[in-house]
Design a protein with these regions (language model features):
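Surface-exposed loop/turn motifs in large extracellular/passenger domains
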Residues: 21-81, 86-116, 121-157, 161-197, ...
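Gram-negative bacterial Sec-dependent N-terminal signal peptides
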Residues: 1-20
């Protein structure tokens, strides 16, 4: 279903010939002005600059106000739109171009209600138009923003920057070529109720479903910042975005960077129903030349801090969100810098996963999509996360060739807090629902995980490739990293708990040095085939002083049908650790693990070192499972107690070095070298 109701969600639909009268409005024309319940034209539009519509735009109309800055405030009353800059709508004069300019804009809202808050300027079905706005300062401390009765699939309430819209649907507007150029944007929110998505940047919206040469809508802006210190946010589909939006066919956005900061030091809950996204939104596009696109020539970030209560219902995303919904829809996003997430709020409860890179979601009949970022960083100091933590990007695909890549390194640093899902150093590629496609979430550099405190439910050093539902046709999922490094010097590591929709999903392992390939038990054998792959050139795990409550695997982990995990060189070092609990023993595997009809888990070279540690289960110098292979293995044990077996089988060649006082329950297999 095309977004035929989206137009109603963003602005009024009345724009055809039958509605030629100028809309009720108040235009400040650069004069510092305060509006309230006593102001004229209640339910109309408010502009800090000039208002241009239809017949009042002629060949000689002066649209250039670049030397004029604006400053308007709304304290009460009920209006349609509050616009900091200029507004131009469906001009009658169509022979020439329209360069609509304004200087810096400032717009403040302390009370009252509007359906749409726009910090910059707006163009509505205005062809051959360039909308130029200086820097934007937008402040909201109270009031109601958005349409409470909207039935839109994604209502929008507040836009920090500028807004351009058009449709190609016959009789509904003018197919327009419009570009908005906006400077740096700051949107600060300390109160108010928002019945729709909030964007720190600008929005380009083609709300029609008709393909054609036009509309062509573009937003170009500087750095956008969304700062939240209070408020209630009711956008169940989307949420809050530091960046901009490209919505509909041939919509595009370009910026210099974006960020979201949520800081609550009050006693009032900040409740966000929806996602928190540092970058842009891309959705409802077309295919080929009709695809949506986003280019961020800089970095993106999300920070969640403060002593007060903060609640989110959906995922927190450091990069951009590509949400493909239409048949054959395609989309692309690039971030030339890094994406960063910092969570340091003891009273924050995040309802879903944390994704360091960009997130790409597709449906059964959508097309290809790609997202990339140069590097990512996720830091968790305090708070509760009721989902997985992904260092790289994520793909949840059902069709097409879909990728979310990190063209550099990823870093996850956990100093405290609770993660009720798995911590995944690389990317997460997910495919399912009996569809077909090729999904990938790769990291070209090194994925790093550093844990000094807190509690997490599983650690995966590399990426996670995952399939669910029933078999598809020729479907592939890949989550690979160049190298993986895990350093754990404190905290508690429980077994892997993969948080997703449906029944609880766990693996009997706490730490995996490489990647994990995992298909649900609803996936059958080779009819049709499925390929789930993770690769790592080298994996390194160092555990010193932590508490680990389930098995430890130095290599990769392949679980169930179609799964492959490969690591060239796996290194595992354990010292002064507490392994196991009263109810569970812990086994240690130098190599990889393959189980339940997995294709293979392979390690070319494995190194294991255990010092001053008691192992409640067994130690395997090779791997585990019929399809698990290890080339060469070396193990060094110093002052180690192994309650059960020391298993020296599972590798082509094994060397063992004993130092100090060691104790084992039994020995299985034979090493080629003992010292």
């Amino acid at each position: 279903m095309k977004k035929t109701i989206i137009a109603a969600s963003l602005t009024a639909l009345a724009m055809g010939p039958a509605f030629a009268a100028i809309n009720p409005h108040n235009e400040a024309m650069g004069k510092e002005t305060t509006y309230d319940e006593k102001s004229d034209n209640q339910k109309g539009k408010l502009t800090g600059g000039w208002y241009y519509q239809e017949e009042n735009v002629q060949e000689n109309t002066d649209l250039n106000h670049g030397s004029v800055s604006t400053n308007i405030t709304l304290t009460g009353g009920s209006f349609d739109e509050l616009i900091g800059g200029n507004h131009i709508k469906q001009p009658t004069y169509k022979e020439g171009t329209h360069n609509v300019t304004i200087g810096d804009t400032k717009v403040t809202m302390t009370g009252g209600s509007v359906e749409y808050f726009i910090g910059g300027s707006k163009a509505n079905n205005s062809d051959k138009t360039t909308l130029i706005t200086g820097d934007v300062t937008a402040v909201i401390s109270g009031g109601s923003i958005g349409n409470q009765s909207s039935t839109s699939e994604y209502p929008v309430s507040a836009i920090g920057g500028s807004y351009v819209k058009s449709t190609g649907n016959p009789g509904e507007g003018t197919p327009a070529s419009t570009t908005a150029e906006t400077g740096n944007i700051s949107l600060s929110i300390s109160g108010g109720t928002f019945y729709g998505a909030v964007f720190g940047g600008s929005v380009a919206d083609n709300y029609g479903s008709t393909e054609g040469q036009k509309p062509i809508l573009k937003n170009i802006s500087g750095i956008s910042e969304l700062k939240i210190q209070g408020g209630k946010f009711e956008s169940s589909k989307f949420g809050v975005f530091g960046g901009s939006a490209a919505i509909g066919m041939k919509s595009a956005t370009t910026s210099s960077g974006s960020s979201v900061s949520i800081n609550n030091t009050s006693e009032t809950l900040i409740d966000i129903v929806g996602r928190v996204v540092g970058g842009d939104l891309l959705t409802y596009g077309g295919s080929g030349e009709n695809a949506t696109s986003s280019k961020i020539n800089g970095s993106t970030s999300v920070s969640i801090t403060g002593s007060g209560e903060i609640k989110t219902s959906e995922s927190v995303i450091g990069g951009s969100l590509l949400n493909l919904l239409e048949k054959d829809e395609e989309s692309s996003s690039t971030i030339s810098g890094t994406s960063e997430i910092v969570i340091d709020a003891a009273n924050a409860v995040l309802g879903d996963e944390v994704i360091g890179g960009s997130y790409v979601r597709t449906q059964k009949d959508t097309g290809d999509a790609s997202a990339s970022v140069k590097g990512t960083s996720v830091t968790i100091k305090a708070g509760t996360i009721n989902g997985n933590v992904v260092g790289g990007g994520k793909v949840n695909g059902k069709h097409g060739t879909v990728e979310s890549s990190v063209d550099g390194d990823t870093v996850i640093s956990i100093f405290g807090g609770t993660v009720n899902g798995a911590v995944i150093g690389g990317g997460h590629a997910k495919i399912g629902d009996g569809t077909s496609g090729d999904m990938s979430a790769d990291v070209t550099g090194t994925s790093r995980i550093q844990i000094t405190g807190g509690t997490v439910n599983g650690v995966i050093g590399g990426g996670l490739s995952y399939a669910y539902g029933t078999n598809g046709a020729d479907w592939k999922s890949t989550a690979s990293v160049g190298k993986s490094e895990v350093i754990i010097t404190g905290g508690t590591i429980e077994a892997v708990n993969y948080v997703a929709t449906g029944p609880k999903q766990t693996l009997p392992v706490a730490i995996v040095g490489g990647g994990v390939s995992w298909s649900k038990d609803t996936i059958s054998g080779d009819n049709p085939p499925i390929e789930l792959t993770t690769t790592t050139s080298s994996s390194s795990v160092v555990i010193d002083g932590a508490t680990v409550k389930d098995d430890i695997v130095g290599g990769g982990y392949a679980y169930q049908t179609g799964s492959t995990a490969s690591v060239e060189n796996a290194s595992l070092s354990i010292s002064n650790a507490t392994l196991g609990s009263d109810s569970n023993k812990v086994n240690v595997y130098a190599g990889g693990f393959a189980s339940d009809n997995a294709k293979s888990s392979s390690v070319e070279s494995a190194q294991l070192q255990i010092t001053a540690t008691s192992v409640s289960g067994s130690v395997y110098t090779g791997g585990s499972g019929t399809n698990s292979t290890v080339g060469t293995s070396s193990a060094a044990l110093t002052d180690v107690t192994i309650s059960e077996a020391l298993d020296l089988s599972g590798a082509t060649e094994t060397a063992v070095v004993f130092t100090g006082v060691n104790s084992v329950g039994s020995v299985t297999g034979t090493a080629q070298s003992y010292t």
